[in-house]
Amino acid sequence: MALLAIGGLSSCEAAPQLVYNGDTLAWNTDWKRTQCGTLDISKNIIEVSGIACSRVTPGYIWMQSDERSNYIIATDEKGAERACKVKFPKSIRWDWEDLSGGVYEDKNYLFIGAFGDNEETDGNYSVIYLEEPAIDPVNTPEITLTPGNIKFVYPDGKKHNCEALMYDNLTQTIFIITKVYYNVCQVFSMPFRLDYGDETQTLEYICDLGVRSDLGYSEKNQPYKGFHLVTGADISPDGKYILIKNHNNIVATYSWILYWERQDGESVADALKRQPQPLKCYSYEWQGEAICWLDNNTFYTTSDADDGNPPIYKYTRKWPEGINDPIVNDQMVNRLIMLGTTLFVRSAEGLYTLDGRKVE
C-alpha cells in the first residue's frame, strides 16, 4: 500500500546512481520509456499494485488493487476501457499487493500475493492462484471464480510486510520479496503445486537485496536512500530476465528498476546474488508499484494512485539504428540469419541477438 512521498527531487528527475553491495552501479541504457496509455480508474480499478500480461488472450493486461477489492480486471495498454472483471468470494484475504503470471503443467495461471502487512502484526499470508481465463469483452465481460489459496509462513517465524511476487516458468517456483523500511529487503521462495490443500508452507530464504550499509544513515531525521521498499517484481516468460522495482515514498526519486540477466543454467537465487543493473530510462512514478514483462523486449509499469488517472508506461529495448524488434517488424524478416541453432539479426553494424545485443 502506497504512502505519501514527502521528500526528494521532483518526479520528472531520475534517481541518482545506486550504491548496492557496496558498489556504485553503472546504468543500463539499453531501454527507453514511453507512455502508452492512461488508466481510467472510473472504468477499471484504483490503487493498482500488481499487473500481469495475459498469455491466454494477448493484448491485455491483468490488474489487481490493494484497496480491499475481491476482483481483478483486464484492460489493454491504453487503459481506457475494462475488458474483463473476475470476481472472487469475499472470504478471500483482502490485502493484495502483487500479481504475476506463469505456466504450470501446460496451463497458464495467475498468482495474487495476499501478503500485505504494513504493521507486521497480521501473520495471515497466502498466494491466491487461478487458471487464467480467456478475455472476451463482448460475451463474458464479468466472471466469478473460486481460486486456490496457498498459506505460508516465513522461515524465521516472524511477520513481514511484502508487496512483490514473481514466478519462474523454468522451475515453477514462486518468489516473494519483503518490503522493508530502513533496511534491506529479503527474497523467499516456494515451489508451486496444486495439491497443498490447507497445509501451511514454510518459505525458503534466498538472499538479501543489497546490504544494510548501502542505505546510509539518517541525518536530521532524513530517511535512508538506498534500495529498499520493494513493491514489484517479474521474471520474463522464458526465465531469462528479472526485474525488481522499489518505490521510495519518503525520498521520492530514490526509486529504481533493477535488471538481471540469467546465465545459461543459472538459478534465480544465484542470479539475484550478482550485481544488478539499474535502468537509466526509469524515473519516479507517483505511487508507482506495479511491473510486468510482455516479452523479452517489452515491459510495463503503472501506479497505485487512487486519485486522478495514472499513466501506463511501456518500456522497450533499444535497437541499433535501422533495426526494430525483428519479431514484430516484417521488414526485418530478410535480415534474419540462422547460425547453428541460434537466430540473429544482420545490420550494417554487424550481428545482433534477438534481444538487441551485439555479437562481438
Walk through the language-model features, giving the residues of each:
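C-terminal outer-membrane/trafficking sorting elements
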Residues: 321-360
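Bacterial N-terminal signal peptides
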Residues: 1-8
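Sequence/structural signature of beta-propeller domains
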Residues: 15-320
